[in-house]
Amino acid sequence: VALINNQFLPYPYYAKPGAVRSPAQILQWQVLPNTVPAKSCQAQPTTLARHPHPRLSFMAIPPKKNQDKTDIPTINTIATVESTITPTTEAIVDTVATPEASSEVIESAPETNTDQVTSTVV
């Protein structure tokens, strides 16, 4: 702890070395008031020039690592539009060409098998 005795400060202020403080707290120590302190400070000339510690809600606290904990699946919270399921009928055409070695000219169409398939589209 170093005593800061400056001609611009009306009372001596104590400052802790910055090596043991976090960067956020170092900035708090570097800004010292150079105006006349409030009446509560005038009654106690050895008051430390420090700001109160930030509340815990402002501090970053890492989560506890629990190895027994199972993974929680992520849930998509984006609202999806529910659509009505409508059955559709699609015709699947299976074209089979029979490669027969023939000298005859075949003028008919190739064999086709048509199957009816019913699927649901979402």
UniProtKB/Swiss-Prot annotation:
Q: In which tissues is it expressed?
A: Mammary gland specific. Secreted in milk.
Q: Where in the cell is it found?
A: Secreted
Q: Where is the composition biased (Polar residues)?
A: 110-122
- GO annotations of cellular component type: extracellular space
* Result, substituting residue 99 to L: In subsp. Sitkensis
Give a Pfam family name.
Casein_kappa
Q: Example GO biological process term?
A: protein stabilization
Phosphothreonine modifications at: 98
Task: Write down the glycosylated positions.
Answer: 74, 84, 86, 89, 95, 102, 118
Modification Phosphoserine, positions: 102, 119
Is the Transport keyword given for this protein?
no
Return the annotated site residues (Cleavage): 58-59
- Spans through the membrane: none
Q: Give positions of region: Disordered.
A: 99-122
Q: Which UniProt keywords apply?
A: Glycoprotein, Milk protein, Phosphoprotein, Secreted
Q: Which family does it belong to?
A: Belongs to the kappa-casein family.
Question: Per its database record, what is this protein's job?
Answer: Kappa-casein stabilizes micelle formation, preventing casein precipitation in milk.
Q: What is this protein called?
A: Kappa-casein
Look up and give the organism this protein is from: Odocoileus hemionus
> What's the gene?
CSN3
